[in-house]
Amino acid sequence: QSINNNNRRKRIVKNAYIPSRGIRKIPHLSTLLPEFHICKDGKGAEAVVGWGLRPTTHKARAFAAEHQLPFIALEDGFLRSVGLGVAGYPPYSIVYDDIGIYYDTTRPSRLEQLILAADTMPSETLAQAQQAMDFILQHHLSKYNHAPELSDDHPLRSPSKPETVLIIDQTFGDMAIQYGGADASTFELMFQTALNENPQADIWVKTHPDVLCGKKQGYLTQLAQQHRVHLLAEDINPISLLQNVDKVYCV
């Protein structure tokens, strides 16, 4: 029986052509993609792997189309690491999508299909999902898991604070913005809408962690320098932050 199982495992492992040297250098990539044998050339490839919708995937996508091979899109996992990727911290998870990618609104994605099929999933799967969500909230898990809790003396923890509105910024030029049907004007509209809809509230703008560490630019940094608008320019655990505001705006 063990021999048959080993043979079965060998048959389901496919040769995956990954043109990107950067992807191939991801630590423990073979563990994250156990169903693939990773190849740096296209000979004998049964699938092609690239990173999301970055322009650098053009070569990989063209090769997949030319040879009629499935293309697998990867992205950072939603619970990625214990530090920023731009600071060199390796991923502990990745998103794997054989249909599209979750932030692309122009086509379906595997995540979208899973969500649409939620009503038909086994009760055990739904229970496991609920358990995972509860675990995330209980332990304040996030994408990078490096930021401290909101401090006890932070104004957002004050029991006498006014209604509080949080606006979420993003890194400039992020693929999720472009393929999510948004641009810089969308962020400006969101910002002005938040101000207009909440005239008596304190407005807080949360800067993206990659902007805080100086690696990237944001959309709202300059807009945030206005009356009754506060810029959260420090690392804060996102769940800790969300638990201390009344309303959230995001693109």
Where are these regions (language model features)?
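A nucleotide-sugar donor-handling region in carbohydrate enzymes
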Residues: 83-180
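Short, well-ordered alpha-helix to beta-strand connector turns
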Residues: 44-47, 68, 244-246
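Well-ordered, non-membrane alpha-helical segments in soluble/globular domains
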Residues: 57-58, 182-193
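N-terminal pre-catalytic "stem/leader" segment of glycosyltransferase-like enzymes
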Residues: 6-61, 172-174
